[in-house]
Amino acid sequence: MQIFVKTLTGKTITLEVESSDTIDNVKSKIQDKEGIPPDQQRLIFAGKQLEDGRTLSDYNIQKESTLHLVLRLRGGGKKRKKKTYTTPKKIKHKHKKVELAVLKYYKVEDDGSVKRLRRECPNCGASTFMANHKDRLYCGRCHLTLKLEA
């Protein structure tokens, strides 16, 4: 039977084969016609690469079927060297959580009442304390400044 082999250049070769021929035999016939060594040849039929030990009938290759010839690529990408850094890595800052930090904003009086040690901002509302400076109180969020009477 006759099959066609289409090369990378677009040239079509006709080969006379039998359905019992192996893929190795087909590759050697291509070598006789084109001069490409069989170890560099890859034959593709119906989107599948043909393995050397199997026959044409295994892949259901019939008369006047077209095989595509592509060349095997040698090697792969170049291996990259791992970078070595001369300076040691910077140690990340670890957040230290103080368990009872809230207690420094309040004071419990002798009679049991709770007094705020820092003043809250009247604009921003609760939980935004104002910074104590020697002559003023300052809110870092809304930039409100209150002068203290001496």
Curated annotation (Swiss-Prot):
GO terms for cellular component: cytoplasm; cytosolic small ribosomal subunit; nucleolus; nucleus. Signal peptide: none annotated. Pfam families: Ribosomal_S27, ubiquitin. SUPFAM superfamilies: Ubiquitin-like (SSF54236), Zn-binding ribosomal proteins (SSF57829). There is a cross-link at G76 (Glycyl lysine isopeptide (Gly-Lys) (interchain with K-? in acceptor proteins)). The keyword S-adenosyl-L-methionine does not apply. A zinc finger (C4-type) spans 121-142. The keyword Ribosomal protein applies. One of its GO terms (biological process) is cytoplasmic translation. Keywords: Cytoplasm, Isopeptide bond, Metal-binding, Nucleus, Ribonucleoprotein, Ribosomal protein, Ubl conjugation, Zinc, Zinc-finger. There is a cross-link at K6, K11, K27, K29, K33, K48, K63 (Glycyl lysine isopeptide (Lys-Gly) (interchain with G-Cter in ubiquitin)). In the N-terminal section; belongs to the ubiquitin family. In the C-terminal section; belongs to the eukaryotic ribosomal protein eS31 family. Ubiquitin is encoded by 5 different genes. Ubi1 and ubi2 are synthesized as a polyprotein with one copy of ubiquitin fused to ribosomal proteins eL40A and eL40B, respectively. Ubi3 and ubi5 are polyproteins with one copy of ubiquitin fused to ribosomal proteins eS31A and eS31B, respectively. Ubi4 is a polyprotein containing 5 exact head to tail repeats of ubiquitin. There are 2 genes for eS31 in S.pombe. This is Ubiquitin-ribosomal protein eS31B fusion protein.
